[in-house]
Amino acid sequence: MRIVEIVPVTKTKYRVVTDEQLAFMLYKGELSRYRLKENGELSAEIFQEIFREILVKRAKLRAMHLLTRMDYTEAELEKKLMKGEYTPQAVKIAMDYVRSYHYLDDERYVARYLSAYQGRKSRRQMQFELERKGIPREMIQRRQEALDDEEGCVDETDMIRQLLEIGRAHV
């Protein structure tokens, strides 16, 4: 594998692009440690070491860091990691890792979201927002039905009346 270019992103962070259209980020010290240079050769062994020791580890830590701040859906977290320019394989491994420890669980995310917004948002609005976050429609409907069975169905017309009364009180 040949290194086509090494582009500085910040003072210490560089994007390494290979002839196989593979791009990944490394810090200045890592470039020096592995003696990577533009138009230089990147052996499969060195790339595997970089992948295992740096890229996968960094992707896992980033995923866990993001999840400590707030819950993400699988699609949101994957998009966020890809935006960080981790390789697709590193993102997949990181996603599998956080999923294996149940740090990432779309079913739980949907249940918490529906519980939090039930009574304030319509079913359709919640479904739309969850679909936009990458949740499959079937999962949303299944969780809505389960929530209705647990807590009793919320009548949307009563909710609209309550909101109208609140609006009139503020006028």
What are these regions, as identified by a protein language model?
Residues M1-R168:
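An alpha-helical, amphipathic repeat domain used for nucleic-acid recognition
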Residues V171:
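Calmodulin-binding IQ motif helices
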